Curated annotation (Swiss-Prot):
Annotated organism of origin: Protochlamydia amoebophila (strain UWE25)
Gene designation per UniProt: ackA
Binding site for ATP: 15, 210-214, 284-286, 329-333
Gene3D superfamilies given in the database record: 3.30.420.40
Free-text comment on the cofactor: Mg(2+). Can also accept Mn(2+).
Entry similarity comment: Belongs to the acetokinase family.
Classification via PANTHER family: ACETATE KINASE (PTHR21060), ACETATE KINASE-RELATED (PTHR21060:SF15)
UniProt keyword annotation of Transport present: no
Subcellular location: Cytoplasm
Main function: Catalyzes the formation of acetyl phosphate from acetate and ATP. Can also catalyze the reverse reaction.
Protein residues bound to Mg(2+): 8, 382
Quaternary data: Homodimer.
Protein name: Acetate kinase
Site (Transition state stabilizer): 182, 243
Length: 395
């Protein structure tokens, strides 16, 4: 049976998943690997059906050698699920920024890789790593077609007045406009929640909260992106792990003029030293909760404040709200943050079931039975969505 391999390359981890071409549901991966690079000793875990390994330490810190070692576990060892490499017919890659060039999956060639590279200045934390992952797997699987699936593509349905900045129009003509990100995750959650909702006559209005180290909201009407908090780059919008989110642009001009900061220093500070880390001393929300000091509490309060006001803005874009969804590492696991956010949005008709909110991490509804607005927690499955997008494009 033909199979599709998916790579989701991140700054501190690589996720690999293998699916058959008969993808039925998000839990249908035949094989999964998760490589963690952000520790002193890089490690990975493997999953094959219900069988899951303990962390296995890599014998190298080289990304290239580490991925090669893990990929070979597809056909070697206790977690092997294929006998020969040629059982894999397609490979899908997540790419964060597709700009105005890519609105659907695309077969990767030299020209596409050049375009992805040229867009790296707009997503410096992501596109270079995505491109590195593509080139690594191309060397391992040189005769297999590789496809790119873009996080920006889901937001192509935003209207002109939403994606256009109030700056000189000539800038827009040169491609400076709002693109939005986390589209693969937002699209996945919208599809999953559709299964929970009874058909209704009026358009279904969902706000999806993807809260991880990067964070964004998406206003979704009947499965289509209407508005989102990220923009030209993944720096706009909510407060994030190490990124500032939206700030007064006058601050940047002031710092360049009066603080003797170079463009490179300013870029680094806003991308790597701001957000939760800049205020609370760490980008890890679990540590923010654990520190219990003035700065960590301020960071948490700021995060929730910007989250709730962002949800309010997305509600205005939709003209109402039928459902709210939390996903991503923070969204799925931080019950306190969900509770505080929903309490402060009670005026919208959000009524949280506190007991359901505390439960495990499976997909679930966590609102009261009679809550006017339904609230969900969904474990995002970007790799499945990438595989499905590739197969739909091919057929």
């Amino acid at each position: 049976m033909p199979k599709v391999l998916v790579m989701n390359a991140g700054s501190s981890s690589h996720k690999l998943s293998l699916f058959s071409d008969k993808i039925e549901n998000a839990g249908s991966a035949l094989w999964k690997a998760h490589i963690e690079w952000g520790k002193k000793n890089p490690s990975y875990t493997l999953k094959n059906g219900s069988q899951e390994s303990n962390p296995i330490y890599l014998q190298t810190t080289s990304v290239k050698q580490g991925i090669q070692e893990v990929i070979e576990k597809l056909w070697i060892g206790d977690f092997a699920v294929i006998k020969e490499v040629h059982e894999i017919e397609w490979i899908g890659h997540r790419v964060v920024h597709g700009g105005s060039l890519f609105h659907q999956p695309v077969l990767i060639n030299a020209s596409v890789k050049k375009d992805i590279s040229n867009l790296s200045s707009l997503a410096p934390l992501h596109n270079p790593i995505n491109l590195e992952g593509i080139e690594l797997l191309e060397k391992i699987f040189p005769s297999i077609p590789h496809f790119a699936v873009f996080d920006t593509a889901f937001h192509r349905t935003m209207r002109e007045e939403i994606k256009t900045y109030p700056i000189p129009y000539e800038w827009k003509e040169k491609g400076i406009e709002r693109y939005g990100f986390h589209g693969i995750s937002h699209s996945y959650c919208a599809k999953q929640i559709k299964k929970w909702i009874k058909p209704q006559e009026t358009p279904f209005k969902l706000i999806n909260c993807h809260l991880g180290n990067g964070a964004s909201l998406c206003a979704i009407r009947d499965g289509f992106s209407i508005d989102t908090t990220m923009g030209f780059t993944p720096m706009e919008g909510l407060m994030m792990g190490t990124r500032s989110g939206s700030i007064d642009p006058g601050i940047l001009i002031y710092c360049l003029r009066n603080k003797n900061l170079s463009l490179e220093e300013l870029d680094h500070l806003l991308n790597f030293e701001s957000g939760l880390k800049g205020i609370g001393g760490t980008s890890d929300m679990r540590e923010i909760h654990a520190f219990k000091n003035k700065q960590s509490q301020l960071a948490l309060d700021m995060y929730i404040y910007r989250l709730k006001t962002g949800i309010g803005a997305m509600t205005a874009s939709l003209g109402g709200i039928d459902a709210l969804c939390f996903t991503g590492g923070i969204g799925e696991n931080d019950s306190y943050l969900r509770k505080k956010t929903c309490e402060e949005l009670a005026y919208l008709g959000i009524q949280l079931d506190l007991q359901k909110n505390q439960g495990g991490n499976q997909d679930k509804e966590i609102s009261l039975h009679d809550s006017p607005v339904k609230v969900f927690v969904i474990h995002t499955q970007e790799e499945w969505m990438i595989a499905k997008s590739c197969l739909e494009y091919l057929t």
